[in-house]
């Protein structure tokens, strides 16, 4: 349930989607057949979906969205939390492993590794034995502030992605 996944980005994602939709004067709709909340950024021609399924069942949403759009999975971007990035860092890459992320593991099992990902850092506790508890804890006020700033960068990156392409978006996100 969302209450138990406090550190994971799923709760913040809903806030981010609502903010992006609001700033673009778009309405968030639920598409239950896709297991997702959805809106279209008209000026950018970008569709954003927020999965309503459990993280471990992420492929359900991903597969239905790909099928719904009659499109190739290479045109889709998965946004996920990443404990291997410091909090608030955002990276864009294509391919790679799951890094222990169960949602990615689930998508990779069904679709392979060849898709783009926006990786949003949530930090690491410093000891692998503490990871499970770490991803279930709430963010501190300072961490929330850092993530709010990351949201602004993420939102700007969508503009760059739509107008200037993937390479420029990667340059924007992957350099600090």
Regions found by a protein language model. Give the residues of each.
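Phosphate-binding/catalytic loops
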Residues: 89-98, 104-176
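Short, conserved active-site loop motifs that form the nucleotide-linked donor/cofactor pocket
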Residues: 7, 45-46, 76
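Single conserved hydrophobic/aromatic residue that forms the stacking wall/gate
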Residues: 1-11
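Hydrophobic/aromatic beta-strand patches that form the interior of the parallel beta-sheet core
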Residues: 49, 77-79, 116-121
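Accessory terminal and edge-of-domain segments that mediate assembly/interaction
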Residues: 8, 18-21
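Short, surface-exposed acidic-centric catalytic microdomains
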Residues: 25-61
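Conserved beta-loop-beta/alpha segment of the NTase-like Rossmann-fold superfamily
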Residues: 62-109
